[in-house]
């Protein structure tokens, strides 16, 4: 019975801490690069401005304000 009470108190504490500090890991879509209409790519391919306050899921990629010619229509038409 004592173990059950301790577990209940621990669960209550965790709920209280989460409520005070908010969501410990915000959802990806809330601050993602592509959700705002930007593009995730490796740094050499970025032809626009690097948008620092949004992030990409892929490691080593940056959030870029405009697509590179490599990923854009020009490359597709030339192929």
Curated annotation (Swiss-Prot):
**Disulfide bond entries:** 33-63, 40-56, 46-64
Domain of life, per the record? Eukaryota
Could you say which tissues express the protein in this record?
A: Expressed in hemocytes (at protein level).
Q: Which UniProt keywords apply?
A: Disulfide bond, Immunity, Protease inhibitor, Serine protease inhibitor, Signal
Q: How does it assemble?
A: Monomer.
Function description: Involved in the melanization cascade in response to lipopolysaccharide (LPS). In vitro, reversibly and competitively inhibits trypsin (Ki=8.6 nM) but not serine proteases chymotrypsin, elastase, subtilisin, thrombin and plasmin, cysteine peptidase papain or metallopeptidase carboxypeptidase A.
Name assigned to this protein: Panulirin
Q: Which taxonomic lineage does the organism of this UniProt entry have?
A: Eukaryota, Metazoa, Ecdysozoa, Arthropoda, Crustacea
């Amino acid at each position: 019975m004592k173990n059950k009470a301790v577990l209940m108190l621990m669960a209550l504490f965790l709920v209280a801490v989460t409520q005070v500090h908010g969501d410990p890991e915000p959802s990806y879509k809330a601050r993602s690069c592509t959700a705002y209409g930007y593009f995730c790519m490796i740094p050499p391919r970025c032809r626009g401005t690097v948008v620092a306050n949004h992030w990409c899921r892929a490691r080593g990629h940056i959030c870029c304000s405009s697509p590179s010619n490599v990923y854009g229509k020009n490359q597709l038409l030339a192929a």
